[in-house]
């Protein structure tokens, strides 16, 4: 044995020495134990929480073990809301035959999560459960398999909620479902009972709480009280089984009497119906008897629906000149936010009935989407990244007000939304909604240009909620406002609605003119005056990032104007000048940078400007730095990962490169070379380090490979943001650098393998952060697939040879394939009017 150990040590020492002398690979191999887009097991289940719900309707999460958590149905996130709510099975005549239908409790819940110091009371953690679980996601479906030596039943759990591209209403339902399938894996008949149990977690405030009956289930209910109408809420839980027995009121007592007696009922298979009481029922249960012959399989469908029609959310200061809207128009029936579904359904009964009546059809259509998406032959890390981040659309990050308009946070704090107002400079990155739900995306453009923009063309980059005109008392966001102009072009090309463009274009033109007059008053084609941006600071002097937005906006407004036969000569002249300046004065031969300028401008000096800025302060020490280095929070000679972001957005919007392609590619290659780190152990990050740290890898926002790093560079410069990782990756791929782009994607997703972070919650300034939906751009990056509804042209420009991929348009979704240079289209839902196919620049016969 000793000899074997010595031999092993010698062998490993030799291998370690040999590897240390090997040349470093350009592209890192995946290191995660979880294979991309495959099943999660064991420790990779730890942090999984899969959102189930509707667009702007709230959600709950199905965890990797089968547990319920993150119950957020009150128009706000409640990240640590994990009420006592669980399913169970009891097999008659089997020792240890009663189990919670979940895998083992993740160890991080033992100690460290809220309230664990009190022993994890009022949870199901202490109840027997299945030995093993595995989890697989095929958005919007999640599947869990449970096995246990004591239970001769194979259990499959499927959680889902409607998600049908092009059908925003049925994708916005306050509903979800968990299907429990049981297959007798033994050789004899099994008598079992499925059950589901929940406390009344809707109880809140001083109003009456009760548990009410509903067909084959119960409703957890809280009546409104005079102090707070938003406390009103209902949550229905019911099955599709006519044999369902309902206990509407658990045993009432002290300490843990209710759960103790409920578990006794589960173990002994007591099927005793209990009527509802007037108020204060602690919880309720559903029981469904199951007889299974050997090899027989049965499924119990558990339907969940909720109804919380009011909130106390009102954001943004009203404009003093705003015209009060007519409540009959549906624009602002309440001074506070009300969800879209509150206008469709009058109460929980209507919501639950609609869910039950349309269940089969909605599942079929959602399955069509899932099958079409995962039919793709694209790299698994890409399919995982894109689909996992579609979960953001199920999360409380997204709200949809009563009249159907979309509004969103940037992300979610633990108990509230984070960073309000459909923030334009963050939502610039998000490419999913414009393709999956184009009509909803257009409501964002309508809000930006007709509600949040004043007569001078200034846009408030954070819109009010309920959506209405607000005061214009802060700087416009240069990247957000210029990006919005490009996105109008995108929405026009996706929808083919030229009348919409015609009506909106005067506002677009006013916005463009405001940007020119404010940031380029000398008409140089660059943003010279201090300009606010997504880093929550102002850049002083021209820089590559914001100039790329400027040139993209000038190109898009020129093309839209030409279509409408408008005079766009001024914009074209500025575009030409800006290109020349960026090439000649903002490019160092390898990448684009910033020329810091703070003197000789129209703007007052940085000290005066800082008085109206957010979180900026020129102390005595900072004033010394100002004289030495210039304004705080710049990037100067740095290599910025977002340095050509506007050019990426231009391509995502269907525009050509506004700048010399070789220079753009060179910049992206430099970002990959200098900013991607596969081990951050020695990286200094005094900002927000937990996005990526230690042995993890990530793409840094900025580095200074040629020197010139400032004492106080822009405030997030040392961080890693997934949204930027994906946009750089997809842009690299667009430019032909597939291996480099995929390396970034893998490095990012390895951090989200379920062991430490939730694979379905990429966070930045909050959970389910919107910027991460830049991942959707990977589809276009790899395949070049894009449909232009104005010209009825399907574009294909593959970077990976033959493929099959998903496409979603205004009128339907399906798959596009490329085989031996020939493209084909298969629509599985709706239709697509294609009059021409262009493959890599050449027209292909239909």
Please report, for each region that a protein language model flagged, where it lies by residue:
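Bacterial Sec-dependent N-terminal signal peptides
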Residues: 1-25
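Acidic/polar, glycine-enriched structural segments that form the non-catalytic walls/loops
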Residues: 21-33, 39-44, 48, 143, ...
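Beta-strand-rich N-terminal accessory domains
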Residues: 23-110, 376, 386-389, 393-396, ...
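Non-catalytic C-terminal accessory modules of carbohydrate-active enzymes
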Residues: 56, 69, 75-96, 100-111, ...
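Aromatic-rich carbohydrate-recognition surfaces in CAZymes
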Residues: 90-93, 97-101, 108-120, 184, ...
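Short, well-ordered beta-strand segments enriched in hydrophobic/aromatic residues
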Residues: 176-184, 821-828
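C-terminal substrate/ligand-recognition segments
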Residues: 177, 288-293, 300, 419-426, ...
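Extended glycan-interaction surfaces of carbohydrate-active proteins
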Residues: 379-413, 439-472, 518-542, 583-721, ...
